[in-house]
From Swiss-Prot:
This is Histidine ammonia-lyase. The modification 2,3-didehydroalanine (Ser) is found at residue 142. It is an enzyme of class 4 (lyase). InterPro entries: Aromatic_Lyase, Fumarase/histidase_N, HutH, L-Aspartase-like, Phe/His_NH3-lyase_AS. PROSITE patterns: PAL_HISTIDASE. One of its GO terms (molecular function) is histidine ammonia-lyase activity. Keywords: Cytoplasm, Histidine metabolism, Lyase. It comes from the Bacteria. It holds the Pfam family Lyase_aromatic. It comes from Cereibacter sphaeroides (strain KD131 / KCTC 12085).
Length: 507
């Protein structure tokens, strides 16, 4: 169970909720602020002054006053009308993370919902009631309206949810878990759907997967360095200290540790006629390290956003209810674009290492396409082509999304972030990157084995052994698709990187 303190939740907690399915609830000390804001909204609803989302219409209809007798129906109508999502549903793990993020936002005590709204969300998370949320339809301002409406629909007994391995109507799913739908009070529907939690959940998932890929890239690229008998001189700490970037320094240190004790490296330390390795070998710390720095910058933004109150209007500490723009997901959009760039570049340089290893003119005496009998066998020829295809896909997906705004809601909402699909694409990019890195691992393992009787280092030998437990050495040609998939799984689960048994850079 993760006890979430609003404003203080950590990325480690959020990753545990997403990756491990940990349950989550708010710390009890959040309740007084939540209830105080709810009382302030109730007072506003009983008054005559117009308060957006309490006794007015929404968006372009904000100037229309709603009668006190209709405020409950107003909130219900809001949820129903905004359930306009399309496409495949969110992955359940990401949907649950989104729900936890909504808890954190409501827990700041600035949204004006009653504690029973918080309690129902907590109950759904505890009982495994996961709303079915179509993943397309948000432009990332005014918040992630459509997807969050599908979440809120289940809370009022509408929509659909998965529970106990079954997909049920919302009311039935709640009943299955011993929960009851809630009748929304003033502003509560708006508070549930106005926010960036959908985009942020997807961006965090991309971040967590991206960091694991970066760790794998360091390990696999070290194995590739030994496969082509690359130099470790460019990893010397003095070089990286003179530049000063933290990620570069860490990447070089990690690779030095991974290659320490390699007999392959020692065999060509003297008398090697090659003066410099190609950039994809020599500049690995500069590229992967820079990607790590970018991922950490994105992590800082997303950690802040995860703890933010992104509702509108907000109940301020002095009791005033004020309209603002915290629902605009521009920070999330920028973070997603940064993550996309990092994923693309990690894959781009990895693909060049694959290309280098299969090319006998560059691989320093490795056989063409890493097959023991080239000509009769094509070896890893088309595996390299697959990595090129996936690299190109990722390059296209790395184009920024925050620059593509369009006006909506009759020009009232005239600039939007497009953070939602900017964050969603990260899942596809990570899938592609895992295949690129897994294929590199297969090539590197094959290359290192061709250097026998010389052996790689102990840490990299353990990595090679872990790979070989899933992917046999390639002799005669065989169908390679299962091998590529198995290697990609080792990358995504972190098993390949962990096999080295060395500390790896932490997010």
């Amino acid at each position: 169970m993760e006890i979430l303190v609003p404003g203080q939740a950590t990325l480690a907690q959020l990753e545990a909720i997403w990756r491990e399915g940990r349950r989550a609830r708010l710390a009890p000390e959040a309740r007084p602020a939540v209830e105080a804001a709810a009382a302030r909204v109730a007072a506003a609803a009983a008054g005559t002054a117009p308060v957006y989302g309490v006794n007015t219409g929404f968006g372009k209809l904000a100037s229309l006053k709603i009668a006190p007798a209709d405020t409950a129906q107003l909130q219900r109508n809001l949820i129903l009308s905004h359930c306009c999502g399309v496409g495949e549903p969110m992955p359940p793990s990401t949907a649950r993370l989104m729900m936890a993020l909504k808890l954190l936002s409501l827990g700041r005590g600035a949204s004006g919902v009653r504690w029973k709204i918080v309690a129902l969300l907590e109950g759904m998370l505890a009982a495994g009631v996961t709303p079915v949320i179509p993943a397309q339809g948000s432009v990332g301002a005014s918040g992630d309206l459509a997807p969050l409406a599908h979440m809120a629909a289940v809370m009022i007994g509408e929509g659909e949810a998965e529970v106990g391995g079954r997909r049920l109507p919302g009311a039935a799913a709640l009943a299955h878990a011993g929960l009851a739908p809630v009748a929304l009070g003033p502003k509560e529907g708006l508070a549930l759907i106005n926010g960036t939690q959908f985009s942020t959940a997807y961006a965090l998932a991309g971040l967590f997967e991206g960091w694991r890929a970066a760790q794998a890239a360091l390990v696999i690229s070290a194995l590739s360095t030994d496969a082509i008998m690359g130099s470790t001189a460019p990893l010397r700490p003095e070089i990286h200290a003179l530049r000063g970037h933290a990620g570069q320094i860490e990447a070089a240190a990690t690779m030095r540790a991974l290659l320490e004790g390699s007999a392959i490296r020692e065999s060509h330390r003297e008398g090697d006629q090659r003066v410099q390795d190609p950039y994809c070998i020599r500049c690995q710390p500069q590229v992967t390290g820079a990607a790590m720095d970018v991922l950490r910058m994105a992590a800082g933004t997303l950690a802040t956003e995860a703890n933010a109150a992104t509702d509108n209007p907000l109940v301020l500490s002095d009791g005033r209810i004020v309209s603002g723009g915290n629902f605009h997901a521009e920070p999330v959009g920028f973070a997603a674009d940064m993550i996309a760039l990092a994923l693309s570049e990690i894959g781009a340089i990895a693909q060049r290492r694959v290309a280098l290893m299969v090319d006998p003119t560059l691989s320093f005496d490795l056989p063409p396409f890493l097959t023991p009998e080239p000509g009769l066998n094509s070896g890893l020829m088309i595996a390299e082509v697959t990595t090129a295809a996936l690299m190109s896909e990722n390059k296209h997906m790395a184009a920024p999304t925050v620059t593509d705004s369009t006006p909506t809601s009759a020009n009232q909402e005239d600039h939007v972030s497009m953070a939602a699909h900017g964050a969603r694409r990260l899942g596809r990019m990570v899938e592609n990157l895992a295949v690129i890195l897994g294929t590199e691992a297969i090539c590197a393992a094959q290359g290192v084995e061709f250097r026998a009787p010389l052996a790689t280092s102990a840490p990299l030998g353990a990595v090679l052994a872990r790979l070989r437990a899933e992917v046999p050495r390639l002799g005669a040609d065989r169908i390679l698709a299962p091998d590529l998939a198995a290697a990609a799984r080792l990358v995504r689960t972190g098993a390949l990187a962990r096999a080295a048994g060395l500390p790896l850079p932490a997010l």
